[in-house]
């Protein structure tokens, strides 16, 4: 209770913007588009972005398209004006975890050959405190894409799209993270050893309680000054490193009308080929320390490096939908598949990853349209997650990775919609 209080936030923003768009045909088969937008706000720097797009109708069946653009995202009202927000969550105390590992590698402590959380607890509730920052800059991105649209004349109703895209985003707004801050605290404490224990505080953003006298011996035996549990980690919003994403999207759309009804088919597939965040500043320092072997392999670094396939960032997503309509009746069936990824915090000391497998769900609906007191009405019955697929097991709240999956199981709803 009251472990994650959120205070009221107030703020205001006055924005002046200007937008200009020009569509300029070059030939009968080639057209271009040029757009420019400028925004000026009173609480962060102004920004000017633009877009250039070109399309070429090679023949009645094939069109090529490409675009390049810049974009920005202003810091939101909360990120600029947050007076203070606290979030509590269970986290690893990597200082304690490493102390356990060091003692166990040395044969234990005080006659105990296996030091665990029952001796000194390495996993408990830790608060994160954050405040807004009026020094935040807007996120900026450069985007490009190239693709094609294919509508074969010999198959009426069929359309295939294929696009390759890339995004480079700078000044991404985010948090350094509790985990990373505690890892930095661990580095500083093991580097300091047993020197000046009365005055040494480690990472000043990791605020700890006074050491427990009954546990002090574990830390001195491992070669560091005794510590208490983490009271809170100060983690304010900041503009972080450059983020790069790239991938390929494909779409297949097919509609056909028959005496048995109108049928539709849609497939959308997305393959992410790159998702990285450059290590800079504190991130770069931690990465260099890990590469030097000063941070063990079983201690994860969050939020930078190669993020593809990590912690909910699956690299494939497939959506399939089939629909039918005849008169007042209609039906649909759809499938959603999300690819596998690994949970970084469960990586073993030898580098073995815990892989969370892909998840596929199927939905189905039946609908009937009619008139109700002269108004258009529709009654729909739907079954979500037809096969009662459960979310794959993960070391998270409720046993699954909520950032990527839902675990509702099979569920139903009946919907009546009336248009007046």
Where are these regions (language model features)?
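Outer-membrane beta-barrel signature, preferentially recognizing the C-terminal barrel domain
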Residues: 11, 74-160, 233-247, 258, ...
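Outer-membrane beta-barrel transmembrane domain signature of Gram-negative proteins
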Residues: 1-31, 279-313, 317-319
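Hydrophobic, lipid-facing positions within transmembrane beta-strands of outer-membrane proteins
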Residues: 16-22, 48-54, 132, 142-148, ...
């Amino acid at each position: 209770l009251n472990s994650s209080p959120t205070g009221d936030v107030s703020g205001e923003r006055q924005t002046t913007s200007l937008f200009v768009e020009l569509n300029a045909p070059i030939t009968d088969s080639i057209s271009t588009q040029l757009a420019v937008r400028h925004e000026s706000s009173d609480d962060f720097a102004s920004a000017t972005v633009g877009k250039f797009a070109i399309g070429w109708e090679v023949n009645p069946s094939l069109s090529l398209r490409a675009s390049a653009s810049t974009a920005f995202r202003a810091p939101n009202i909360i990120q600029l004006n947050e007076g203070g927000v606290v979030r509590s969550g269970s986290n690893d105390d990597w200082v304690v975890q490493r102390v356990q590992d060091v003692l166990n590698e040395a044969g234990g402590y005080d006659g105990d050959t296996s030091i665990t959380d029952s001796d000194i607890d390495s996993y408990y509730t830790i608060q994160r405190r954050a405040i807004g920052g009026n020094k935040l800059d807007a996120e900026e991105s450069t985007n490009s894409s190239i693709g094609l649209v294919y509508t074969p004349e010999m198959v009426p109703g069929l359309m295939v799209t294929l696009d390759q895209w890339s995004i480079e985003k700078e000044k991404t707004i985010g948090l350094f993270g509790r985990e990373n801050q505690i890892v930095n605290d661990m580095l500083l404490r093991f580097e300091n050893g047993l020197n000046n224990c009365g005055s040494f505080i480690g990472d000043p953003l990791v605020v700890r309680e006074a050491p427990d006298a009954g546990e002090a011996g574990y830390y001195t035996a491992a070669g560091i000054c005794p510590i208490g549990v983490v009271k809170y980690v100060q983690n304010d919003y900041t503009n972080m490193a450059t983020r790069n994403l790239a991938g390929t999207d494909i779409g297949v759309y097919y509609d056909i009308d028959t005496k048995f009804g109108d049928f539709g088919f849609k497939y959308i597939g997305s393959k992410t080929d790159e998702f990285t965040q450059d290590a800079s500043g504190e991130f770069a320092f931690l990465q260099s320390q890990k590469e030097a072997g000063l941070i063990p392999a079983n201690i994860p670094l969050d939020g930078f490096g190669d993020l593809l396939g990590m912690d909910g960032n699956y690299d494939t997503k497939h959506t399939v939908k089939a629909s039918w309509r005849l008169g007042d009746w209609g039906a649909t069936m759809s499938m959603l598949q999300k690819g596998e990824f690994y949970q970084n915090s469960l990586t073993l000391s030898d580098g073995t990853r815990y892989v969370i497998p892909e998840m596929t769900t199927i939905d189905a609906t039946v609908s009937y349209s009619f008139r109700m007191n002269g108004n258009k009405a529709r009654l729909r019955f739907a079954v979500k997650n037809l096969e009662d697929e459960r979310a794959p097991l993960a070391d998270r709240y409720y046993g699954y990775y909520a950032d990527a999956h839902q675990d509702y199981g099979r569920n139903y709803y009946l919907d009546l919609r009336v248009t007046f």
